[in-house]
Amino acid sequence: SQRSLRSCTRQTDKGRITAEAVLLSTDCEIVARIAAAADTFIIEQAVWELLRQGAEYAPSGGAVPALIGAEAYFGVAPALSRAFPDPAQDFVREMFAECVKAVLQSETYLYTQRGFASGQEYQDNWDVSHPDSCRYYSHLDIVESRWFDHIGPQPRTGNLFHRHKNVAVWRCGEAGLQATGSFLDSFHEVGVVVDCSATGSIERFDATFMRAPDRICFGTAELVQDLIGKNVKQLNRRDINRCAGGGEGCAHLLDISRDTLAELAKSLNAIDGLCR
C-alpha cells in the first residue's frame, strides 16, 4: 500500500492565507482547503472533497460552516472535533488538521502581519511560549543554530510553505513487511524504515534526519528504536508519543512514525483478512 500527503500555503493579495492538503493513497483521494485572515488566522472558508474511496469514484464533500470563525492555530483541536463528531469522518478532520499545521509553519513569513516588530521578536516569543516542547526548545542554551539562521533571511510573499509525507509498504522476505516513511517540508527532512514479522513484531526501526534547525535535533532519531520488539497491531497513539514525543523528542519524527506504523498495521490487518 502507498500513502502520499501534500500540504501547502499561499498568501493572497487580499490579506488572506490559503492552505490546502491533498491525500492520495491506496484507500482514497481527498482534498481539504481553508482560507484565513493573514493577521488573525481566523478561518473564513473551509471546504473538502472526497474524490475516491477504495475503488469507488463517487465525489462527496462540501463546505464546513462549523470551522468558520475558528483560529487556525494551536488549540484548534476542539473546533475540529465539533465539526466532525462522527468517527467515520476522522480522516476528513485529519486533513483539516494538516491545513492548520501548514498555516502554523507559515507564520514565520507572516510575523509582521501577526504583530511582531521583527523576526527576532517572533523568535523570542516562540522561545517563551514553547519551552520543553521538543529537544530543540528544551536545550536552547546549547543549540548552535537559531531558527532564522536555519531558514535564512529571505522573506516569502507568495508561496509560503510546502510539506510532503510519503509512506510505502511492501513484502520483505518470505513473510514479513517493510515500510518506509519520508517527511519533507520547507524546513525539515526525516525518513524512517520499519521491518516487521508476519505477526506484526517490529524487528527494525531506523530514522535518519537530513535537515533540521540544529544538529541537536538529529539525536532524536535513535528514540524510535525503543519500539523494536513491540507489536505494530497493538501499539496505540500514547505508546508512539511516549517514544518520540515530549521534551526530548521531535514532533516531525513523531508525525511520520505514526503515519508509517498506521499504514503498516493496516497492511497487516488486510493480509490477516485475506488469510481467514
Model regions and ranges:
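Active-site- and interface-proximal helix/loop "cap" or "latch" segments in soluble metabolic
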Residues: 2-140, 183-276
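Two-metal-ion RNase H-like nuclease active-site motif
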Residues: 178-182
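Short, compositionally biased leader-like segments
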Residues: 138-177
